[in-house]
A protein has these predicted regions:
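PAS-family sensory domains
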Residues: 2, 120-132
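Sensory modules in modular signal-transduction proteins
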Residues: 5-34, 40
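A glycine-centered beta-loop-beta connector
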Residues: 32-33, 103, 118-121
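Generic structural signal for well-ordered beta-strand positions
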Residues: 36, 75, 106, 122-123
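Sensory helix hotspots in PAS and closely related PAS-like folds
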Residues: 43-44
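Terminal output helix/cap of sensory domains in signal transduction proteins
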Residues: 53-100
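PAS/PAC sensory module
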Residues: 93-95, 104-110, 126
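PAS-family sensory domains and close relatives that share small-molecule sensor folds
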Residues: 100-102, 111-117, 128-131
């Protein structure tokens, strides 16, 4: 008998609740590297409601956004703020280019940080971002 998907951690649940109530674009990646949520404000920049695809791997999500350096050169997902927060377990900030599902290339600033619980266990990554024009 299948036990279903693993339960989400309390810090991740609370982060999702925070994101759902903010006008700041935000997305969440769990400790397994799965994109588990992005809020309505993020939908405007990403170009598609979260409910249309649901949870997907962060690698797949990053590939679909075709992330690039400010000058348009390729950007390794590991070097994105979310990648640094996930792999190096530290906050990161960067200006980059992303192409939303709507095909629009945008210059965005992204800040991401690891989400640690009270026991220092990493529960995932929180990223906030905003379009900067240019």
């Amino acid at each position: 008998m299948s036990s279903g998907p693993p339960a989400k951690s309390l810090p991740l649940i609370l982060a999702r609740e925070l994101a759902a109530n903010l006008a700041t674009p935000m997305f969440l990646i769990d400790a397994a590297g799965t994109l588990v949520f992005y809020n309505e404000a993020a939908e405007l920049l990403i170009g598609r409601p979260f409910g249309e695809h649901g949870e997907i791997s962060a690698v797949e999500f990053g590939a679909m956004l075709r992330l690039a350096e400010e000058d348009g050169s390729p950007l390794r997902r590991r070097d994105t703020p979310a990648g640094v927060a996930f792999w190096e377990r530290r906050p990161a900030h960067r200006v980059l280019q992303a192409t939303g599902y709507d095909g629009v290339r945008r210059r965005v600033e992204v800040t991401a940080y690891p989400l640690f619980g009270t026991t220092e266990e990493m529960h995932g990554v929180v990223a906030v971002f905003w379009e900067t024009g240019g």
